[in-house]
């Protein structure tokens, strides 16, 4: 390690004390008077009071000057007892070390490790904060007695265990339930009397009645909630099934369809006796029946004229083939012209033209008879 001002030593305890230890070793080897302090330092024991007060000046001695130029570097003068106590963990003698700032002030004229001019930004701080920083390690031995104290401490009382649940017999439960049905609340004398009867304590009877009352209330509440739920679900399901009666009632209330005669059609007044537009097919069928009946009436009139005989038989020879080709039904109609006239008149209400045609057939019948 070079001690030139260009290279600086790391600022740590081990880096500062290691060159001091080597320098003191060299001094002890050259000077026989320093054997006792170095032996105390090696063995880790406290130095005697006489050696503790002795100081070795770092002056123009050859061995000390050869060791890192410590005078020029401005390293503080340390006693062997202080260094030995610091390295062995005994901090009681740390107050004997000289202040670091005083040494730096005295050696400000020579070139040192940290420069000639100290930085004015940092305050003047002592090396080890004076004698108040001494630590008394002798009291640490009392920590070993904590184990004995913990052993001597009595264990903490555990929480009281819960009493085991008492199970009632069937006879006791039956008697309690029977009395509960009669009376839900018992007075103190009644409770004591019941407890003596079933061999229980009044407290047990009281607690059983309290629990049973709560149980009954909870069951009643659950039952009411279940019934309400069933009603809600039943009302929702029954709403779809009740649609049929509602539809039937609506149909009953709706007006019936009634056939109304048409008085005006396409801006033209219709006949008073004209049927409704929907009866066109019925009217056509009635007209066909009327035509058939008219033909039958003519044939019947011809048959009557033929059956009556007389001079008309030769005058009308054309009627004989027609009368001979008629069916037996026509002969039946010819035999009973009154029935034929009644049938024709019964269909006269279907159509005015049919009724007029019926009157014409009646006139032809009368005319045929006269003729």
Curated annotation (Swiss-Prot):
The keyword Transcription applies. Keywords: Activator, DNA-binding, Homeobox, Nucleus, Phosphoprotein, Transcription, Transcription regulation. It is found in: Nucleus. One of its GO terms (cellular component) is nucleus. It comes from the Eukaryota. Residues 219-294, 308-342 are annotated as: Disordered. Pfam families: Homeodomain. SUPFAM superfamilies: Homeodomain-like (SSF46689). Residues 161-220 bind DNA. Phosphorylated on serine residues. GO terms for biological process: cell differentiation; positive regulation of DNA-templated transcription; regulation of transcription by RNA polymerase II. Residues 244-253, 272-294 have a biased composition (Low complexity). Its main location: nucleus. The keyword Hydrolase does not apply. One of its GO terms (molecular function) is RNA polymerase II cis-regulatory region sequence-specific DNA binding. Residues 233-243 have a biased composition (Gly residues). InterPro entries: HD, HD_metazoa, Homeobox_CS, Homeobox_NK-like, Homeodomain-like_sf. Thyroid, lung and CNS. Belongs to the NK-2 homeobox family. Transcription factor that binds and activates the promoter of thyroid specific genes such as thyroglobulin, thyroperoxidase, and thyrotropin receptor. Crucial in the maintenance of the thyroid differentiation phenotype. May play a role in lung development and surfactant homeostasis. This is Thyroid transcription factor 1. It comes from Canis lupus familiaris (Dog). The gene is TITF1.
């Amino acid at each position: 390690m070079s001690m030139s001002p260009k290279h600086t030593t790391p600022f740590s305890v081990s880096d500062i004390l290691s060159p001091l230890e080597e320098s003191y070793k060299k001094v002890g080897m050259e000077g026989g008077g320093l054997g006792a302090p170095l032996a105390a330092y090696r063995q880790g024991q406290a130095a005697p009071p006489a050696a503790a007060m002795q100081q070795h000046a770092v002056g123009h001695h050859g061995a000390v000057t050869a060791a890192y130029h410590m005078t020029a570097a401005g390293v503080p003068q340390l006693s062997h007892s202080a260094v030995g106590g610091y390295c062995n963990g005994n901090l009681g003698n740390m107050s004997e070390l000289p202040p670091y700032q005083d040494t730096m002030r005295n050696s400000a004229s020579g070139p040192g490790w940290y420069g000639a001019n100290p930085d004015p930004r940092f305050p003047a701080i002592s090396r080890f904060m004076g004698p108040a920083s001494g630590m008394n390690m002798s009291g640490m031995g009392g920590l070993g007695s904590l184990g004995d104290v913990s052993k001597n401490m009595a264990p903490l009382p555990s929480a009281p265990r819960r009493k085991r649940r008492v199970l009632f017999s069937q006879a006791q439960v039956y008697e309690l339930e029977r009395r509960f049905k009669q009376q839900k609340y018992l007075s103190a004398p009644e409770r004591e009397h019941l407890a003596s009867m079933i061999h229980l304590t009044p407290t047990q009877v009281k607690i059983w009645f309290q629990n049973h009352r709560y149980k009954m209330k909870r069951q009643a509440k659950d039952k009411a909630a279940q019934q309400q739920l069933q009603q809600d679900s039943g009302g929702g399901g029954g709403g779809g099934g009740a649609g049929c009666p509602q539809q039937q009632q609506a149909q009953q209330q709706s007006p019936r369809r009634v056939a109304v005669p048409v008085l005006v059609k396409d801006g033209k007044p219709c006949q008073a006796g004209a049927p409704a537009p929907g009866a066109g097919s019925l009217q056509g069928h009635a007209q066909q029946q009327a035509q058939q009946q008219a033909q039958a009436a003519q044939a019947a009139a011809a048959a009557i004229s033929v059956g009556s005989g007389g001079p008309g038989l030769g005058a009308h020879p054309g009627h004989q083939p027609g009368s001979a080709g008629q069916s037996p039904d026509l002969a039946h109609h010819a035999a009973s012209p009154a029935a034929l006239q009644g049938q024709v008149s019964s269909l006269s209400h279907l159509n005015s033209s049919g009724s007029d045609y019926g009157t014409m057939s009646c006139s032809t019948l009368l005319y045929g008879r006269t003729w």
